[in-house]
UniProtKB/Swiss-Prot annotation:
InterPro entries: UreE (IPR012406), UreE_C_dom (IPR007864), UreE_N (IPR004029), UreE_N_sf (IPR036118)
A Pfam family recorded for this sequence: UreE_N
Compartments where found: Cytoplasm
One Gene Ontology biological process: protein-containing complex assembly
Gene3D superfamilies on file: Urease metallochaperone UreE, N-terminal domain (2.60.260.20), UreE, C-terminal domain (3.30.70.790)
Entry's Gene Ontology cellular component terms: cytoplasm
Name listed for the protein in its UniProt record: Urease accessory protein UreE
Keywords: Chaperone, Cytoplasm, Nickel, Nickel insertion
Keyword Nuclease in annotation: no
């Protein structure tokens, strides 16, 4: 029986070099605390972080033996949205939907309900397989977690 190496730290993008391997994770899989993962080479390792972490592409898992496993954003189904981006971004944000904002397009996770809404607002929408890197949450959480604002938030 072989020993599974453990990663208990994540190094920030730009703060390391010399990855021994890499792993491509989609948006959901990049939100974790403890999980067994398999790197591109087939090597298994256990992620065992102190708290739930929102991983970003370019970061690295630091294995206990000193090796680094680079985190890459994996391909996943997204909607590429173009048109009046300010207006369209407002509607996407109003639904608390994670969104990757670029100068000439928005990317959201593939969702037929949002696709119908956006087309109804005049957007051009195309389905694609791309890495999804949405904006971090406004309050530092790194994730849009639905409509719950906590116990002291009320709508007027």
């Amino acid at each position: 029986m072989s020993l599974m190496h453990r990663a208990s730290r994540v190094l920030p993008a730009g703060g390391w070099s010399g990855a021994a391997d890499h792993i491509a994770l989609d948006y959901e899989a990049r939100f974790l605390r403890r999980k067994r993962l398999v790197a591109a080479s087939g090597a298994e390792f256990l992620v065992d972080l102190p708290e739930v972490t929102n991983l970003r592409g370019g970061e690295a898992f630091a294995l206990e033996d000193g090796r680094l496993i680079e985190v890459r954003c994996g391909l996943e189904p997204v909607l590429v949205v173009t048109g009046d981006l300010t207006r369209l971004a407002w509607h996407v944000g109003n639904r608390h939907t994670p969104c990757q904002i670029e100068p000439d397009r928005l990317l959201i996770r593939d969702d037929h309900v949002l696709e119908t809404m956006l087309r109804g607002l005049g957007a051009r929408v195309e389905r694609r397989m791309e890495p999804f890197r949405p904006e971090s949450g406004a309050y530092g959480s790194g994730r849009t977690m639905g409509h719950d604002h906590g116990p002291f938030h009320v709508h007027a």
